[in-house]
Amino acid sequence: MRKVGLLLTAVLLLAVFSAGCISSSSENANTSEKETTLIVFHAGSLSIPFQGLENEFSAYAEKNLGLKVKFQDEASGSVMAVRKVTDLHRKADIVATADYTLIPQMLVPNYTDFYVLFATNEIVIAFTEESKYADEMKAHPEKWYEILARDDVSFGFSDPNQDPCGYRSVMVMKLADLYYGKPIFETLVEKNTNIYANGTHIYAPKEIQVKNNRIVIRPKETDLTGLVESGSLDYFFIYKSVAEQHNLSYITLPDEINLKDFSKADYYGQVEITLGSTGKTIKAKPIVYGVTVLKDAPNRELAIEFLKFLLGEEGKKVFMENHQDFLNPPVAFGNVPEEIKGLVEVRELTLGQP
């Protein structure tokens, strides 16, 4: 009888253990089913605010949606972010660019049917205390183009073919010609690179070449940040938000050239640039960021939830904390999803509008 009792006990223990394993496996399966990924291609200048926003959204989704959300996050120049979709045919849920016009020009109608304008910025010249003539630059910011033209000074901007900050930087220097009445573009750009201008129309060859070691060009604007911080580069053209996020010194430029002032849109529009990489011509205009969810987004429903989060109070808070101005309200065009209509001003596209 004792043997029978021991055998019965062993069988019961085995049954309990097996049930526990099955239950645990089932729970693990359910947990894994609740894990999901959002793929985001975004401008380099959005890296810090998007990192904060994604962390906030992950916590929100786990608490309110019962989902563990991971982000496959790729920062690049905005032109490259778009071309990952159009040229490389890569899948993504969300594309966010530093120039909203890239979305209607390159993604509508084949890849998306709506877009939202949500944030602004301005071009500044950033540096550190170790940059050559830093004290003079701070004391006399109006001499910025004279300081950059000195033979012992190095400066940089991002590749116009890959990054809006790059084509905006060279357009700023062409606008400076008009504002100051001096050949600043020729001195700073044409003498140092193969980028050239015919009047106020700038041409950026597909393969950008530099003619000396005074100028540095990188795929996206944030690639230059480390060079300035390490002392390898004296100055660079960058967005104000990025300069502040990295605690860099910087000078602001007149509103006539910094691409910040919406009331000066017509003045900015005197200058345009043709990109060798795409063949497209872009007019200078106030800096406005854009975002969209792609038609074939692998996780479209959740991507719309993230977009709602970005455009809501949480997104505004994160952007303000990272020194970037948010449009109030954001402006949406196209076939705007019902879920975000309460957070945006919906406008109709007009003839000739990008």
Curated annotation (Swiss-Prot):
User: Which Gene3D superfamilies has this protein been placed in?
Assistant: Periplasmic binding protein-like II (3.40.190.10)
Checking CDD domains in the record gives: PBP2_ModA_WtpA
Q: Name a biological process GO annotation.
A: molybdate ion transport
Q: Which residues form a coiled coil?
A: none
Please tell me where molybdate binds in this chain: G44, S45, S78, D163, P164, C165, E221, Y239
Q: Where in the cell is it found?
A: Cell membrane
Q: Which domain of life is it from?
A: Archaea
One annotated GO molecular function: molybdate ion binding
| Entries under SUPFAM superfamilies matching the protein | Periplasmic binding protein-like II
Q: How does it sit in the membrane?
A: Peripheral membrane protein
Q: Which UniProt keywords apply?
A: Cell membrane, Membrane, Metal-binding, Molybdenum, Signal, Transport
Primary localization class, coarse? membrane
Signal peptide (from-to): 1-23
Positions of tungstate binding: G44, S45, S78, D163, P164, C165, E221, Y239
Give Gene Ontology CC terms. plasma membrane
Assembly information from the UniProt record: The complex is composed of two ATP-binding proteins (WtpC), two transmembrane proteins (WtpB) and a solute-binding protein (WtpA).
Instruction: Report the sequence similarity comment from the record.
Output: Belongs to the bacterial solute-binding protein 1 family. WtpA subfamily.
Q: What does this protein do?
A: Part of the ABC transporter complex WtpABC involved in molybdate/tungstate import. Binds tungstate and molybdate.
- Entry protein name: Molybdate/tungstate-binding protein WtpA
**Originating species:** Thermococcus kodakarensis (strain ATCC BAA-918 / JCM 12380 / KOD1) (Pyrococcus kodakaraensis (strain KOD1))
